[in-house]
Amino acid sequence: VRRHGTRLHHISTDEVYGDLEIGEPRRFQPGDPYIPSSPYSSSKGASDLLVRAWVRSFGVEATISNCSNNYGPYQHIEKFIPRTITNLIDGIRPRVYGTGEQVRDWIHVLDHNTAVWDIINKGRMGETYLIGANGEKNNLEVTQMILAEFGRSADDFDHVNDRPGHDQRYAIDNSKLVEETGWAPSFKDFAAGLHDTVE
């Protein structure tokens, strides 16, 4: 990057901030401390800090973004939404971990892409931007929306034991991104984006 004078953008996750209590109004802010709760989020946090060190120590022209949960067509089936969809296609009842009350802030992948593009073109060097589309839904609600897309009953799923250390809620305050770049999501209606994904 330094040798070629290349602009660097590092894409990360909101999981570096830990999780929030269900029902509280607070959302993650760019200056929040890192409190990762898994090996994955710890490694992502470490990579963010490495980029910040490159900026400070070597003057690398870089920005960082921490994004909420992506969804959209052709996502890898290990993820929650495509796994639920493919299970229904294959005749397998979807599974919901624990009560399903865990909240995620969903963003369509195309909106994530345009946000990154705007940061690359309009963002300030050395800054961190949080990408989210104000799409908070709990996992039970998302499962039932997918079931409805398939014409299935809202209770046509199985509850399974919750995962150890399952984060409760993610929510992004995207105001810095919006104010500095003018970005806005195209998929403001999660139901429409979910329908697009299923189709």
Regions found by a protein language model. Name each.
Residues 7, 61-63, 127:
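Structural signature of beta-strand start/N-cap positions in the alpha/beta core
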Residues 3, 19, 35-63, 88-89:
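Active-site Tyr-X1-5-Lys
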Residues 9-11, 65, 84:
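Hydrophobic structural elements of the Rossmann-like NAD(P)H-binding subdomain
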Residues 62-64, 95-96:
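Conserved active-site beta-strand element of glycosyltransferases/polysaccharide synthases
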Residues 88-199:
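C-terminal substrate-binding subdomain of Rossmann-fold SDR/epimerase-dehydratase oxidoreductases
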Residues 17-18, 35-39, 63-80:
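Flexible, glycine-rich beta-alpha linker
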